[in-house]
């Protein structure tokens, strides 16, 4: 039996997780390393849908970052720690926007009216943060004279393109880590209810394996949420929340119920 489960791939786990909760009873018998590997796979997919597709599409659309900087970014230069630019710029990259407006000596998120994640450049500073529902969340603000040397312009920025690609990879990995944290947090929340159900059905499941069922049960709802985000919220977020909440409870409940009348996994993975 152990040899049979050792042949289960991450693709097999994904297929079962999204389409066959009745077979979750087999997934809870896998080694912990396989479930961890599955979480990393899902984090990669979620990040690719939410971030990777947008970035790749953007880079292809502009003909590469070098072409973008050379031909599409307004001519700019930094002198005496102050930014001078030919025109205002608003550039969407994935789910983020690079905004430049030198009409503001020191720009703030309050100067921007549209929701989104921003890297905003004023004449003397750069601000990073998010605007959501009229509320601003500032991550950091820095003076330009601490980031760039005098004379920095489009040509110098173009020479730094390789560093931008490295930064994109680092951002991807960071977002993957964030997706893993999100999966763990949601699974912990749902496991509170699922644990009660598992006890009521006399499944013999330990808390760790209930948590594992929740991880698998959340896979499809999280994928759907990411796809909706990629499609610029084709379905309103409030409606999508209700849909995925109902779907998650359904998948998890059926996954817990699949263990009724079966031998509980001999070992807890947590």
What are the roles of these predicted feature ranges?
Residues 152-264:
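Hydrophobic alpha-helical transmembrane segments and adjacent short intramembrane/lumenal linkers
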Residues 11-18, 196, 200-201, 267-269:
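Juxtamembrane inter-helical linkers in multi-pass membrane proteins
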Residues 2-66:
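Internal alpha-helical transmembrane segments
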Residues 1-10, 262-270:
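Low-complexity, intrinsically disordered extramembrane tails and loops of integral membrane proteins
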Residues 52-56, 76-81, 246-259:
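Short, highly charged low-complexity linear segments
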Residues 63-157:
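Long, solvent-exposed extracytoplasmic domains/loops
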